[in-house]
Amino acid sequence: MAASTDMAGLEESFRKFAIHGDPKASGQEMNGKNWAKLCKDCKVADGKSVTGTDVDIVFSKVKGKSARVINYEEFKKALEELATKRFKGKSKEEAFDAICQLVAGKEPANVGVTKAKTGGAVDRLTDTSRYTGSHKERFDESGKGKGIAGRQDILDDSGYVSAYKNAGTYDAKVKK
């Protein structure tokens, strides 16, 4: 069997992949998606001797009939099954040691994960300094919204009759 340091690294990798993508996961059980990711990221599934289909079949073999996840012991059994297929010329123990070294200490890779793109149209639509017309009046210079003051013209109807607006401005218009 593999050395105890390899087993510690193997268990650590199992836990990291088990919680990958699931904030509520405890790290005690791994689902099929994370098992496939582990095999792909750690180069266990090379596409020639071990394919993605093989990975899924082994997962189905080692998990319980109604279970959807595997624990650490089932994980080791699954690695043993894949080891003989991945390293054909070696004995079971040598193949398991080799596959443990592939997996031990690895973490889920986030390369190839798509990022939010900001293209020309997106920049133009979200940059408030480029707004024109009435939309321009809804934001101040810093780009912060003005609230209702930017959406409605607020009239000063402080006159004493409905037709008389802007009280106190008559004296400024009429010179004595």
Swiss-Prot record:
Disulfide bonds: none annotated. The keyword Acetylation applies. Keywords: Acetylation, Cytoplasm, Cytoskeleton, Microtubule. It comes from the Eukaryota. One of its GO terms (biological process) is positive regulation of protein polymerization. One of its GO terms (molecular function) is tubulin binding. InterPro entries: EF-hand-dom_pair, TPP/p25. Residues 132-152 are annotated as: Disordered. Residues 134-144 have a biased composition (Basic and acidic residues). One of its GO terms (cellular component) is cytoplasm. The modification N-acetylalanine is found at residue 2. It is found in: Cytoplasm; Cytoplasm, Cytoskeleton. Expressed in endometrium during the mid-secretory phase (LH + 7) (at protein level). Belongs to the TPPP family. Regulator of microtubule dynamic that has microtubule bundling activity. Required for embryo implantation; possibly by regulating beta-catenin. Also required for decidualization via regulation of beta-catenin. This is Tubulin polymerization-promoting protein family member 3. The lineage of its organism: Eukaryota, Metazoa, Chordata, Craniata, Vertebrata.
